[in-house]
Amino acid sequence: MSQFSFTKMHGLGNSYIYVNMFEEQIPEEDLALVAEKVSNINTGIGADGMILICPSDVAPVKMRMFNNDGSEGKSCGNGLRCVAKYAYEHKLVEDTVFTIETLAGIVTAEVTVEEGKVTLAKIDMGAPRLTRAEIPMLGEGETPFIRENFLYNNHRYAFTAVSMGNSHAVIFVDDVEQAPLTTLGPVLETHEMFPERVNVEFIEILNEEEMNFRVWERGSGVTQACGTGACAAVVASILNGKMERGKEITVHLAGGDLMIAWTEEGNVLMKGPAEVICHGVYEYKIEA
């Protein structure tokens, strides 16, 4: 029997099991199965996945994110805010502004601290990637993939593709509560045009500075929030002429609100909360 200490945290209801790999050890070959086990709500702790906070050669910390199906993702906006909170409060970093390595690249975090506790985290997510090769999608072309039609159940849905280090298909609807989240979501997630699968977002524009948001996450299904998805939604809204670049947009997710801005300089900034749920020790056994 093996075990490790963990902290369960969430960003707007998007919860992960966080493991401090400065102190804990999980064999590389076990990570996918451990992520699947620990995320199980009936036989594990229950979460949208597992995130490792690791040493890095190029930043103070490195984030590795595993979905609850065991697949490894390249980035996670809500996870990054929680990693920023954990790293500062556990003295893995000293400054309130620091970098975090991810499989999608290095991002910059800035934390707001009150009485020694992080109350808010802002992440510079970098520039969105908009070509087919960057997303990635099958096909050729260097122009952004904007409002292309997808036929499902005799209905045409127009989506815009954006990568924020992980791929997103953003669909505009009149009412997110009536969107085909659990039906079209998994169909588009696993469509052959996305070789690495895709996160699917449904967006309802409320006005020039607000939107409602629902998400089907790659490898996790319906979740309360998706930080990179909120960033992709704002980028897609601007590409479609629905919102203005440089303004801070309020994204209303099922779990709460995020503030997103696609700056004139090119980067996307995400600001929102990160909270601790509990700490504990998880025991597991890998069958031979």
From Swiss-Prot:
Record-annotated active site: C76 (proton donor), C226 (proton acceptor)
GO biological process: lysine biosynthetic process via diaminopimelate
InterPro entries: DAP_epimerase_AS, DAP_epimerase_DapF
EC number: 5.1.1.7
Domain of life from the UniProt record: Bacteria
Any single GO CC term annotated in Swiss-Prot or TrEMBL for this entry: cytosol
Keyword hit for Amino-acid biosynthesis: yes
Subcellular location: Cytoplasm
Keywords in alphabetical order: Amino-acid biosynthesis, Cytoplasm, Isomerase, Lysine biosynthesis
Substrates-to-products reaction catalysed: (2S,6S)-2,6-diaminopimelate = meso-2,6-diaminopimelate
Pathway involvement of the protein, from the record: Amino-acid biosynthesis; L-lysine biosynthesis via DAP pathway; DL-2,6-diaminopimelate from LL-2,6-diaminopimelate: step 1/1
GO molecular function: diaminopimelate epimerase activity
Principal subcellular localisation of the protein: cytoplasm
PROSITE patterns: DAP_EPIMERASE
Chain positions of site Could be important to modulate the pK values of the two catalytic cysteine residues: H168, E217
Sequence positions that bind substrate: N14, N67, G77, N78, N166, N199, E217, R218, G227, T228
Pfam families listed in its UniProt record: DAP_epimerase (PF01678)
Family listed: Belongs to the diaminopimelate epimerase family.
Protein task: Catalyzes the stereoinversion of LL-2,6-diaminopimelate (L,L-DAP) to meso-diaminopimelate (meso-DAP), a precursor of L-lysine and an essential component of the bacterial peptidoglycan.
Subunit annotation: Homodimer.
The name this protein goes by in its record: Diaminopimelate epimerase
Organism: Bacillus thuringiensis (strain Al Hakam)
